[in-house]
Amino acid sequence: MIIGCSASQKLAASVADLLDEPLCPVETRKFPDGERYIRVKEEVEGEVTVVQSTGYPQDENLMELLFMIENLKDLGADYVRAAIPYFGYGRQERRFKSGEAVSAKIVAHLLEAAGADEIVTVNLHENCLSEFFRVPVRELSAMPLIAEHISFLDDPVIIAPDKGALGHAREVSDILGCECDYMEKVRISPEVVETRVSDLDVEGKDAVVVDDIISTGGTIVNAAGILGKCGASSITVCCVHPVLVEDALLKIFSAGVERVIATDTLKSDVSEISVAPLIADVMKD
């Protein structure tokens, strides 16, 4: 049985289609005071997969997921797999300042307490997040899907906007068999720090910036400006999770980016690539 919660109903339907399984009808709504109501409209037994990203509004989507997991267990499900394509609160995996809550750890504990038997997610922002769980965690990578989607480019070079994203960029470049580099900050003087492509010459090439998350777009705008000055013939931006806060897309396109491509872990105007095949493959195992 497959269930799609409010944030991922279309994605859940795609997974169900790929597996030729029915999508369980559910009712989700809010009471006038804002509290959440959920109802599963079919008998529940055996293994159930719940698909729900926990992006904005994070608290509402997370609470709905917790309600659904525990409700399914109460209704008779033997095994509940929580497929969380985008894992909200995943960027607070440690205390950056004294007294801060480690949000990712708390969310992990809540999911387990609700009764999740397994977590399936896509490209966690920090690899250590899986260590917060005692139940199995299967982290899937959407980079092969991104590589396939941009294979039409004649002379691509894959660029990580910072060293932290280099692993993602290399995964794409290895699949395509093309060059890869990253943006690095170089101190020119005590007062001046310059950001530039580390080693690679991008002049006349199709530059593809690859990252896991685009939020405000600031990092991408900076990278696009540098790539433009270095003579890239075109600039494409790819990400797994299009958080895209406020006018992020406008800023990115205004910086000279030709196209922005993302997956459907989150709904957006640029979610061209579906991660449904990744989730479906897990359920076949």
UniProtKB/Swiss-Prot annotation:
Cofactors (names): Mg(2+)
- Tell me, what is an example of a GO biological process annotation in this record? 5-phosphoribose 1-diphosphate biosynthetic process
Q: Cellular location of this protein?
A: Cytoplasm
User: Does Kinase show up as a keyword for this record?
Assistant: yes
**GO cellular component annotations of the record:** cytoplasm; ribose phosphate diphosphokinase complex
Pathway stated in the Swiss-Prot or TrEMBL entry: Metabolic intermediate biosynthesis; 5-phospho-alpha-D-ribose 1-diphosphate biosynthesis; 5-phospho-alpha-D-ribose 1-diphosphate from D-ribose 5-phosphate (route I): step 1/1
Annotated ATP binding lies at D33, G34, E35, R91, Q92
InterPro entries named in the record: Pribosyltran_N, PRibTrfase_dom, PRTase-like, Rib-P_diPkinase, Rib-P_diPkinase_arc
Task: Give the enzyme class.
Answer: transferase
**Nuclease among keywords:** no
Where is Mg(2+) 1 bound in this sequence?
A: H125
Binding, D-ribose 5-phosphate:
R187, D211, S215, T216, G217, G218, T219
Where does the chain bind Mg(2+) 2? D162
CDD domains named among the record's database cross-references: PRTases_typeI
Q: Which SMART domains match?
A: Pribosyltran_N
Catalytic residues (positions): K185
Q: How is the cofactor bound?
A: Binds 2 Mg(2+) ions per subunit.
Task: Please name the NCBIfam families in this protein's record.
Answer: PRK00934.1, ribP_PPkin
- HAMAP family in the cross-refs: RibP_PPkinase_A
Protein's job: Involved in the biosynthesis of the central metabolite phospho-alpha-D-ribosyl-1-pyrophosphate (PRPP) via the transfer of pyrophosphoryl group from ATP to 1-hydroxyl of ribose-5-phosphate (Rib-5-P).
Name the UniProt record assigns to this protein: Ribose-phosphate pyrophosphokinase
Its taxonomic path starts at: Archaea, Methanobacteriati, Methanobacteriota, Methanomada group, Methanobacteria
Q: Which gene encodes it?
A: prs
